[in-house]
Amino acid sequence: MNPSISTAGAVVDDFQMSCRFSNFGDHAPESFDSLSCGACFYFIFMLVEHYKDRYVASLCEDTFGVLVCPVDVSDKICNCYNREYVYNIPEFALNSSRIKPLNHLRLDPPLPFQFDLIVKDCCSAARYCCRNTLVKYHHRVDDSPCPPTWDGWNCFDSATPGVVFKQCPNYIYGGSNIKTDYDRLSQKVCRSNGWATPEVNAAAREHTDYTGCMSNGDVEARILAGLLTYSASVIFLIPAVFLLTLLRPIRCQPMFILHRHLLISCLLYGAFYLITVSLFVVNDAPLSSQVFQNHLFCRLLFSIQLRYLRLTNFTWMLAEAVYLWRLLHTAQHSEGETLRSYKVICWGVPGVITVVYIFVRSLNDDVGMCWIENSTVAWIEWMIITPSLLAMGVNLLLLGLIVYILVKKLRCDPHLERIQYRKAVRGALMLIPVFGVQQLLTIYRFRNVCLIYRLLHKSFCRRMCSEILVITSGEAGSRS
């Protein structure tokens, strides 16, 4: 944190009513509000790589706000006296006539949706710290070597020598829908002569260690788990699809046509996951810059993977359940049935829903990083969630009906009751991954610690589904 601002002129005459800002001196509460709010935006967004290289940004010495200019703008124009380039949130600014509202700022790539509300959370925390911690310090007897201070993100009360820990606030992650999944902590060291500076440079500025707030290890573990599990899933699914396509005795049977399309849907989802992660997400990915630009190409690819192919998974699972229930309920089927209506509905309806989703989101929430995250406008995301939940609910109902029909049919021989129930239970367990009922276990958004389990669970269920269908295919082929 090193924006240029003089601390000597920042010290207020009435020291009894001042708020301390680490490295920036003591300020009157109103001046503190303005300076700390500009600093909140600066520290959250303008130190990020893709903005740091494209824009000149610094805190204005008059504490009115933060100066933000494209790198190609002349210094004669880019200065704190030019209102066109000075931004702050009006309700926190010392003089709102000298700044432009922060929500008027437009950067390339775009800032997150409602970024000004994220900054406002930080500004409010700074104001609360000033009024409730920093000012009160001057009205009490306190011999602590480290005075209370606002460091730009967190509020620290006076401290004795040692390490002070503070929970990482959500706003430092720069996204309104990002929440810390467990308690990460920043730390600030208090020494006998005051708050510590980095050991390597005794003349350095006051320092808070926020490395404990970083989640890079979690992200890397999740990416690695995803790559490994979906690679295994694709490896298992490819031979399964080939077997269902090439085995003559079964390739034209309606039930196995459904199996084949379900596995193709799962295969495409896994393949697209590997493609998108390799192109956009991993370190040194060739198209990673498109994520920050919210490029149309990456939005399209992620929409196909995360919306269209996910919906096709659910529609083909539903098709499996509907066809099996119809088969058991009516005891009629045609060996030459092409299932054209199933194909049109299961591949077509998700396509229509996805196209509508893309159109609606582009009008109402056309921000974010390639739409990897859910839309911040909740009702838009329910366009995908509702049909998925509906498909799972119907599948759960049909699973119960199918088990009931199986038990009823198996009771024809009263002497084999234990075997009958064993067969019914085994049949029901085999149908769970085929119908996708296990997806109900992952509706809850797991903590980061459990996301690896979630990836393993999804991939395992796809692999188990392919194994079950291949085994049943082999049995059917051997009987034909």
From Swiss-Prot:
It is a multi-pass membrane protein. One of its GO terms (molecular function) is G protein-coupled peptide receptor activity. InterPro entries: GPCR_2, GPCR_2-like_7TM, GPCR_2_extracell_dom_sf, GPCR_2_extracellular_dom, GPCR_2_secretin-like, GPCR_2_secretin-like_CS. It comes from the Eukaryota. One of its GO terms (cellular component) is plasma membrane. PROSITE patterns: G_PROTEIN_RECEP_F2_1, G_PROTEIN_RECEP_F2_3, G_PROTEIN_RECEP_F2_4. GO terms for biological process: adenylate cyclase-modulating G protein-coupled receptor signaling pathway; cell surface receptor signaling pathway. Present in the head body-wall muscles from the L1 larval stage through to adulthood. Also expressed between L4 and the adult molt in vulval vm1 muscle cells. These cells play a role in opening the vulva during egg laying. The chain crosses the membrane at residues 223-243, 262-282, 306-328, 344-364, 387-407, 424-444. Its main location: membrane. Residues 1-222, 283-305, 365-386, 445-480 are extracellular. The keyword Glycoprotein applies. Glycans are attached at residue 95. Residues 244-261, 329-343, 408-423 are cytoplasmic. It is found in: Cell membrane. Keywords: Cell membrane, Developmental protein, G-protein coupled receptor, Glycoprotein, Membrane, Receptor, Transducer, Transmembrane, Transmembrane helix. PANTHER family: G-PROTEIN COUPLED RECEPTOR SEB-2 (PTHR45620:SF42), PDF RECEPTOR-LIKE PROTEIN-RELATED (PTHR45620). Not known. Putative receptor. Belongs to the G-protein coupled receptor 2 family. This is G-protein coupled receptor seb-2. It comes from Caenorhabditis elegans. The lineage of its organism: Eukaryota, Metazoa, Ecdysozoa, Nematoda, Chromadorea.
